[in-house]
Amino acid sequence: MKKLASLQFFNLKLLLNGESSRGFSKFKKNYKLKAELGRGGFGVVYRAVRTCDNALVAVKFIERSNVKEWARINGEQVPMEICMLAKCSKVRGVIRLLDWYSIPEGFLIVMERPYPCIDMFDFIKGQGKISEDMARFLFRQIAVTVHECVQNRVLHRDLKDENIVIDLVTGSTKLIDFGAATVLRRSQYSDFQGTRLYCPPEWFLHSLYLGREAAVWSLGVLLYNSLNGRLPFRNEKDICTAHLLGPLPFFVPVSAEVKDLISKCLTFDPFQRCSLEAILNHPWVKQQTLSWDALTKNKVQKKTSESSDDHHSETLGDHSETEEDRSPPTSSVSQQPGSADEGVGLSASSSNTHNQKKPNHKEFRMAKTSLLAPPTSIEMKAAVQASKTPTQFNVHTALKNQRQIKKHHSPQPPNSTVLTALRRAMSREAQNRISGVFSQD
């Protein structure tokens, strides 16, 4: 993929320097093309620098063969994306169109590039999920932007977290990628070019795509995703049948007001769905929110507090994981980090570990610590670390640590009691992995 991207970037540079682009040398005089920023279904976006003031910009290249819909600006035929960006030039929450150039092979669209910024997908992914106050701070801006676009008769048609960038300094949001955008009309649309998991059920069931109603649905999906760190639907079947299963599950504690707003946005019947104006006037959206500086400061303080708590409970966590390693393989698989139920699953397993009675484990642990001579804390830590380690590289590291421990300690006669306790501290799975390492050596 990297080779393909670099090849396409090289081809674009050849294109700008070739015979076919001599009539459009103005772009090369005004901008210096850099590396690729990203790509989507409608084009490729590159970094660029404006030569007159060294301002950072983004340049999107669209091939003529990939243009699905055309419009006219001053009598010249251009992709609909350029026309829609021009119509939204005064909308604060839309990425600003700076210039555009027509070349025989396609079009170059020059846009502002907020810096430093991150798209909402990466922002949510980096945080797992965001607080309700921060979600309100961002969602309110997005809803206002979508409403103002509609006021200018522009329908984006691809509202999702990847098409929203967040300024990390101010917290302001910008709606990007108008490749699927079109003129808003009252009648239904016969085509859909956006992301299917953000698409309303009426499109899958009846090929019915209504502009405003579909935008409201996408906003509901976006808000749910920002709070839960996951999309509400896995596939088209979920989208079309979720209303039969009752209210959507929430995996974090949220207020009744935001649940009410999401349920109104994700109403199955498009004609019963709330309007964009109703979203902006909803009590949850109108509720006063902290500033971006205060929100980010609270997030940093919370992370610091959580890391401190993790440090104090490190020993307890090691013992808990040792017990979990003794459980059947199915339970360990269900609690792997990175799974869909990571936040809820881990907290549930933690509470079960402390609340459920485990007489066998408890008696075994009592015998190990009171009746037998226990291994040293350093040896126990190395053993537990080896039992937790999923990869061969970390097993080597644990073994190396054990060898270093033996070097620093004076040689002692073998103690069968200590060896027995150490073996019990390590799971059978870890023993097999370590045996495999020794066999390779």
From Swiss-Prot:
Gene3D superfamilies: Phosphorylase Kinase, domain 1 (3.30.200.20), Transferase(Phosphotransferase) domain 1 (1.10.510.10)
Protein kinase domain sequence ranges: 31-285
Source organism (scientific name): Caenorhabditis elegans
SUPFAM superfamilies assigned to the protein according to its UniProt record, in alphabetical order: Protein kinase-like (PK-like)
Catalytic activity: L-seryl-[protein] + ATP = O-phospho-L-seryl-[protein] + ADP + H(+); L-threonyl-[protein] + ATP = O-phospho-L-threonyl-[protein] + ADP + H(+)
Protein name: Serine/threonine-protein kinase prk-2
Needed cofactors: Mg(2+)
Enzyme type, top EC level: transferase
One BP annotation, GO: positive regulation of TORC1 signaling
A UniProt-annotated Pfam family: Pkinase
Compositional bias segments (type: Polar residues): 328-338
Comp. bias (Basic and acidic residues): 303-320
Keyword Membrane: no
Domain of life: Eukaryota
Transmembrane regions listed in the UniProt entry: none
